[in-house]
């Protein structure tokens, strides 16, 4: 087996930016941001949707404030919502 070809697998804190929920998990993702979590310092990865805010896992519909790419495009060019016209 060749050495040094696999990324480092380490504990990382994920922060759900919608709800503020934080959880510790293993990941190969890297980040320059760090956070103090349970007395230790870990790299911080920000996510828009996690198991705390996704309707499939919560069992209820939550509306998030995060706009999608289509919404940002429509706002930028002043287009009206195509679904609202129907």
UniProtKB/Swiss-Prot annotation:
GO cellular component: ribonucleoprotein complex; ribosome
InterPro entries: Ribosomal_bL28/bL31-like_sf (IPR034704), Ribosomal_bL31 (IPR002150), Ribosomal_bL31_B (IPR027493), Ribosomal_bL31_sf (IPR042105)
Disulfide bonds: none
Keywords, in A-Z order: Ribonucleoprotein, Ribosomal protein
Pfam families noted in UniProt: Ribosomal_L31
A GO biological process held by the record: translation
GO molecular function: structural constituent of ribosome
Quaternary organization: Part of the 50S ribosomal subunit.
HAMAP family: Ribosomal_bL31_2
Name of the protein in question: Large ribosomal subunit protein bL31B
Organism listed in the record: Streptococcus uberis (strain ATCC BAA-854 / 0140J)
